[in-house]
Amino acid sequence: MSTSPAGPAAGSTGPLVIGGLGGSGTRLVAEIVQELGCFLGDDLNQARDNLWFTLLFKRPRWYAEAMARDPQEVKVGFRILERAMVARGELDYAAFSFLGRAVREAMLGRHGQTRAFTPGWPLAQSSRLVRALRFATPHEGPWGWKEPNSHVYLRPMAEHWPGLKFIYVVRHGLDMAFSRNQTQLHLWGPLYGVQPSAAPGVPQPQAMLDYWIKAAERATTDGRRLLGERFMVLNYDTLATAPDRVLPGLIDFLELDPRGLPLDRIRALAVPAASSGRYRQHDLSTFDERSLDAVRSMGWAVD
């Protein structure tokens, strides 16, 4: 399907996007960014995921087909998201066709998810999204969203929004290897050349670590090449344990004046996850040395 031109809305400065692997600490970063005055959407779950992005883009089967067929199709979805969130840009038939297909595939279980959506969820989300498209509320300040899967779309987003800023949240790879949150491995692993070694829910630390490495390498390489200073790698472990080592850089990245910001309230949000350091309870000899060297090269101790 060939789509109409899908550039950013006139006057758009581009969104701030927060992505990373599920369970890497993106929720904490989203909470901090909200405290700093960035609008992340009206339809969020408890983890601060923007559910409109989830509906429109958490679709591995469609993504592979669209990028092979017509990469511009992906950008139609970006226009929908921007219009719904900040009332910028106009929609055409291609946009409503895009939305309709996303809803239909979600309802029929064709998103490529590891488990089906809750019955009625796609209709509820699309209803709120359509209402926002019809009665969109302008937001003049900084805006964006947090949805871990966003990093998969970094390349087309960088092409679509010249002013895009992206925060890639990364957590110790060995902690992530033993995470029960395997969703991205099963959804996107093949895109990165990583095949899950077991069914969803079954521990597969080597495959999880391989995906962590591949995703981080691609995000950082693409982010620095395409965005330069508008790309930030944020270390969750440091943020959660020593926020004052991270907050000044984050505030500078967001181009904010630190005077008057609720820094005490933000520091109070930074509490390490109970699972931090869980890798120490496991036998690391199950990992190949190449993977452990990659973890070390990215700045984490392996002990």
Which stretches of residues belong to each language-model region?
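A general structural signal for well-ordered secondary-structure junctions
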Residues: F39, G163-L164, A301
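A short, structured active-site edge motif that brings together acidic residues
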Residues: N45-D49, V170-H172, P262-I266
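PAPS-dependent sulfotransferase catalytic domain
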Residues: R104-P122, R131-L261
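PAPS-dependent sulfotransferase catalytic core
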Residues: M1-A124, L269
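Alpha-helix boundary/capping detector
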Residues: L44, K58-P60, V170, T183, ...
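PAPS-dependent sulfotransferases, especially Golgi type II membrane carbohydrate sulfotransferases
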Residues: M1-V17, L21-G22, Q34, A68-R69, ...
